[in-house]
């Protein structure tokens, strides 16, 4: 039966009415179309729609032949992921719609996390811009490029709150704060899905990992998560809900257990909360092989795990093949119902319908777009500008930065000329050979005004095996450690200033990249100490996908600029900031600890009955450490500038917030420095007394303002009852009248405070 014949049923008004008891016209059309299609499907074909294998092993010659191709022809596959290239994807869709019985098109997914061919900064870095429009722009460009190359589904955004820098996947999220994380989640969804996925450059977003994956015990990936519902609701769930509220089309369940049950089989999480309480009606997919992994959790072998996942509300099985291979027998045994299978199948088909694949299966297979829309000058320009927004200036003694374009500048370090390591871990879809290096970017910016000297200086680690494990698929050429250091010192001796490009390489953060030590790796530490001993001014350019412990560096290096992994335009973007073309404006969205022993560490913590407000070490009978302050090295919201922003006195319109009313908080910010720049003014609240203990402060607003040198701006925030609400002990979302502190400042530590009474 031709697709156009199937569509014709949706044009019949009587049939429309019969197929859909409720909803608008578009929903009735979709319901009728899918009902008609499912009436024609066998059980095996329905189970096939629930099957999502990896196509990573497909090469050009194997697209049309082989086991997976035969499964497509038999409609035993609902979609693929990890297939790159318009020709291959076009061939796969051809198999599905031209050589199968019912001609059902495929979903084609990919981890388009922070770019496709044009790579933007890692998500943690993007969040440090505090610029939701920039994040939306990044997602829009990513969708344009991915869709031009055949992708119609991205496994992004990742919105897991993380407060433990040992966890490698902190690099993929938006930091530790649920308010900021929620705004970023919405921006990603808007960027990917655009106008409800009507255009051929708009793709299906997938919020992940639902839920709580960022709270893995010990910061170890895939590890257990165990927390109260109160903490879930107040501190971790908000960004997922924000994505749902923004209309995200799909959700990915997480690897971890929630309340003792793997998320993939957790009915309370996936049905009671996500679908019933939040109203999510889209596609729910597992993470990679997570149904099969329930066996290792000690919960169920594959057959029973598949039953439990389906009953919990899971629609699509990534890689495990449990649904396809076991549910038919489970149905015969009456352990699942046909209604449950039908509902999962319907949701997969609805996702395809909303993408427009039934109307045009080749909507995302335009070879001309693939030639015209990938890695364009416009996209590269956006990536360069956005990268510069994400860099965080952590230290700048004596205004060493920006550098003057004169004299001799020594660029030293293993990250200075590491082309494959500029983009971060989730950049497998790009072509690194055409990206510039840091060395190339700085030399291009310096031109003939300054001489740029270069030395690698050291390996990533002293030990070759440790480095091999750390660098993964992006190895760096190793040299003799002693010879590299000697060369670096010779180069440094000829220079006027030293720029050290050090830190993590790309594979040291991201999935399966947990660390117990958060210092800069050993060989690089020794290089930096040797460079400081020369007596020359030293700038540290820090490459990292997580907060690092930088106590020695903060005490001994003149300037520290955290550039994260800035994407395909890293070299030029760093040069723009290094030489003062752009003033750094990034602010941390995750706390930098003084010690791994402080972790998990976050600004919006609860107080204890014996707090230590002065954060003194060994303050007996107070909540502290014998050997370390409670305070972080760099707090949430922190970030310096080349210019000097001065805050006037905090003003509050009233000392009372009336019921159903509002209260205005304002502060005048003046740029008293010599550079134009952005400042992110931050608003925090503290509920002094409540039914349950409340955080010492919570971000409730911010404004990113651009001020020219000498310019002042009145920054205003309006506080309402909604800003005071929280989930109480019965999980009701309420606000309680009482006394509150309102705080405003450039970061979570350096704030002015006023109090008001909420009626």
Segments predicted by a language model, with ranges:
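Glycoside hydrolase catalytic-domain context in secreted enzymes
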Residues: 16-728, 734-748, 754-755, 759
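Positively charged n-region of N-terminal signal peptides that target proteins for export
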Residues: 1-5
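Bacterial N-terminal signal peptides
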Residues: 8-15
């Amino acid at each position: 039966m031709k697709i156009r014949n199937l569509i014709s049923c949706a044009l019949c008004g009587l049939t429309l009415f019969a197929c859909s008891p409720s909803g608008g016209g578009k929903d009735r059309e979709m319901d009728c179309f899918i009902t008609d299609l499912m009436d024609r499907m066998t059980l095996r074909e329905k189970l096939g729609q629930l099957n999502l294998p990896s196509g990573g092993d497909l090469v050009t010659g194997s697209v049309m032949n082989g086991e997976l191709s035969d499964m497509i022809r038999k409609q035993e596959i609902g979609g693929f992921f990890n297939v790159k290239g318009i020709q291959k994807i076009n061939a796969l869709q051809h198999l599905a719609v031209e050589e199968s019985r019912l001609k059902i098109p495929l979903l084609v997914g990919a981890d388009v996390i922070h770019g496709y061919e044009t790579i933007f900064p890692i998500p943690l870095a993007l969040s440090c811009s505090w610029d939701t429009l920039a994040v939306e722009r990044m997602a829009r460009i990513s969708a344009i490029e991915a869709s031009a190359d055949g992708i119609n589904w991205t496994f992004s955004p990742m919105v897991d709150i993380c407060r433990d820098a040992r966890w490698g996947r902190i690099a993929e999220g938006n930091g530790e704060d649920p308010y900021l994380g929620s705004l970023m989640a919405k921006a990603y969804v808007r960027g990917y899905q655009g106008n409800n996925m009507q255009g051929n450059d708009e793709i299906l977003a997938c919020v992940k990992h639902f839920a709580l994956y960022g709270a893995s015990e010990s910061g170890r990936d895939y590890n257990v998560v165990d927390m109260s519902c109160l903490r879930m609701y107040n501190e971790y769930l908000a960004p997922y809900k924000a994505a749902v509220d923004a209309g995200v089309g799909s959700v990915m369940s997480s690897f971890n257990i929630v309340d003792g049950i793997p998320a993939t089989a957790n009915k309370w999480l996936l049905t009671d909360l996500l679908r019933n309480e939040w109203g999510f009606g889209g596609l729910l997919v597992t993470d990679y092989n997570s149904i099969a992994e329930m066996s290792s959790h000690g919960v169920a072998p594959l057959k029973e795990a598949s039953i439990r996942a389906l009953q919990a509300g899971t629609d699509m099985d990534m890689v495990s093949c449990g649904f396809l291979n076991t549910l038919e027998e489970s149905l015969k045994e009456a352990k699942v119902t046909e209604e449950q299978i039908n509902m999962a199948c319907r949701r997969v088909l609805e996702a395809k319908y909303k993408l427009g694949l039934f109307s045009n299966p080749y909507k995302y297979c335009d070879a001309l777009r693939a030639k015209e829309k990938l890695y364009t000058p416009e996209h590269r320009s956006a990536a360069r500008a956005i990268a510069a927004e994400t860099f965080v200036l952590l230290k700048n003694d004596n205004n060493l930065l920006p550098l003057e374009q004169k004299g001799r500048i020594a660029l030293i370090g293993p990250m200075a000329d590491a082309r494959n390591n500029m983009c971060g871990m989730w950049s497998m879809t790009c072509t690194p050979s055409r990206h510039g290096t840091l060395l190339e970017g700085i030399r291009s910016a310096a031109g003939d005004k300054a001489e740029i000297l270069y030395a690698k200086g050291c390996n990533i680690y002293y030990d070759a095996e440790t480095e091999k494990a750390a660098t993964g698929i992006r190895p760096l050429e190793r040299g003799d450690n002693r010879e590299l250091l000697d060369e670096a010192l010779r180069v440094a001796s000829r220079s006027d200033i030293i720029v050290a490009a050090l830190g993590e390489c790309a594979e040291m953060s991201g999935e399966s990249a947990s660390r117990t030590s958060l210092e800069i790796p050993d060989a690089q530490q020794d290089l930096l100490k040797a460079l400081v001993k020369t007596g020359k001014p030293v700038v540290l350019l820090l490459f990292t996908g997580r907060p690092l412990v930088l106590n020695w560096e903060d005490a001994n290096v003149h300037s520290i600029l955290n550039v994260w992994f800035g994407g395909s335009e890293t070299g030029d973007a760093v040069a723009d900031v290094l030489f003062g073309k752009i003033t750094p404006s990034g602010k941390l969205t995750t706390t930098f600890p003084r010690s791994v022993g402080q972790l998990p560490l976050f600004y919006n913590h609860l107080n204890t009955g014996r707090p230590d407000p002065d954060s003194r070490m060994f303050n007996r009978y107070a909540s502290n450490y014998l050997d370390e302050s409670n305070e972080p090295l760099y707090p949430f919201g922190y970030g310096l500038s080349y210019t000097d922003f001065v805050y006037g006195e905090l003003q509050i319109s009233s000392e009372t917030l009336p019921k159903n009313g509002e209260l205005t908080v304002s502060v005048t910010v003046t740029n008293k420095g010599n550079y134009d720049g952005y400042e992110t003014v931050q608003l925090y609240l503290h509920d002094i007394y409540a039914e349950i203990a409340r955080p010492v402060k919570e971000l409730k607003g911010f404004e990113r303002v651009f001020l020219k040198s000498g310019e002042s701006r009145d920054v205003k925030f309006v506080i309402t009852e909604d800003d005071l609400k929280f989930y109480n002990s019965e999980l009701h979302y309420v606000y309680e009248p009482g006394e509150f502190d309102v705080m405003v400042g450039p970061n979570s530590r350096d704030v002015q405070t006023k109090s008001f009474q909420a009626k």
